[in-house]
Regions:
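A short, flexible loop at the N-terminus of ABC-type nucleotide-binding domains that lies
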Residues: 1, 8-20, 68-70, 109
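The feature captures the beta-strand-to-loop junction immediately N-terminal to the Walker
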Residues: 34-36
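Helix-to-loop junction immediately C-terminal to a conserved catalytic motif
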Residues: 49
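Conserved ABC transporter NBD signature motif
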Residues: 57-65, 74
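Conserved ABC ATPase "signature" region
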Residues: 110-127
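Catalytic Walker B motif of ABC-type/P-loop ATPase nucleotide-binding domains
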Residues: 155-158
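Conserved ABC ATPase "signature" C-loop
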Residues: 209-210
Length: 273
């Protein structure tokens, strides 16, 4: 679905932000791109959707080279959800906002109407609302509805839960995870929050200064304290606690697993007494 082949990128008169990067994301994967500030996450996300073109190397999306494919064709395959929803909201009503991207891409009018109404229903949005009078959580839901209405094959999420409370965060991420699980939507989530990554991503790419330090299943990456330290990332709490507790806790990964093991150990102690 998305492949980087020896990609480098540099801004004019500066050293490379991305020196030499290669990775591949298959259709239907939920992948997190993790790194601290300055790791190159934003540059990679913009290279992934064709907003930036590589200085050298090749980026392909669904088999199409971003350097040689029309931007409109890439836009039909890749959707981008900004960290701040206000960066993409520009229409007077919610309905106009959801339909705007599809109209720009040249979708037939009847299809635009059908997809818009379906998106409004899915995300419980009133099409007549003004986007600028809604809460941050509602605006983020609107931005996501707009992104998904065009049925992209790959969605890039840039720190998608920044500024949201726990309830709003869970609602949005659960919906994204459901689309990934049930419809095979490919997700690339740019994120530094390891708790969020642990909860949703199946695989993690760990970056530091544009270099790929690690690539593997989330469970494996979460237990590699040396790797996370090199990338200046704070470990998720439960896997880190399990590593600190040592023998017998090595395989513990979630709150439920930790609770089950502690309960089991407590039961053994009661039996011994």
């Amino acid at each position: 679905m998305l492949e980087f082949k020896h990609v480098s990128y540099h801004y004019p008169a500066t050293p490379p932000v991305i020196p030499d990067l290669s990775f591949k994301i298959e259709k239907g994967e939920f992948v997190a791109l993790a790194g601290s500030n300055g790791a190159g996450k934003s540059t990679i996300s913009r290279l992934s959707n064709g907003l930036l073109l590589p200085s050298s190397g090749e980026v392909t999306v669904g088999g199409f080279n971003t350097k040689t494919t029309r931007a409109s064709q890439i836009a039909r395959k890749v959707a981008f959800l900004f960290q701040n929803p206000d960066r993409q909201i520009c229409q007077n009503t919610v309905r106009e906002e959801v339909s705007f991207g599809m109209r720009v891409q040249g979708f037939p009018e009847e299809e635009i109407k059908a997809r818009t109404e379906a998106a409004l229903e899915t995300f419980s949005l009133n099409g007549d609302w003004s986007p600028f009078t809604r809460s941050r959580g509602e605006r983020q839901r609107l931005a996501l509805a707009s992104v998904l209405a065009g049925k992209p094959e790959l969605v890039i999420l840039d720190e998608p839960t920044t500024g949201l409370d726990y309830k709003e965060c869970t609602a949005i991420m659960d919906h994204i995870a459901k689309l990934n699980r049930e419809e095979g939507l490919t997700i690339l989530m740019v994120c530094h929050d390891m708790e969020l990554i642990q909860s949703y991503a199946g695989r993690v790419l760990v970056l530091n200064r544009g270099t790929l330090l690690g690539d593997g299943p989330t469970r494996q990456i979460m237990k590699d304290r040396e790797l996370l330290s090199k990338a200046r990332l704070r470990p998720a709490q439960i896997p880190d606690l399990a590593l600190r507790l040592g023998a017998g806790f090595e395989d513990v990964y979630t709150v439920d697993e930790m609770a089950a093991l502690l309960q089991k150990r407590a039961g053994h102690k009661e039996g011994e007494e």
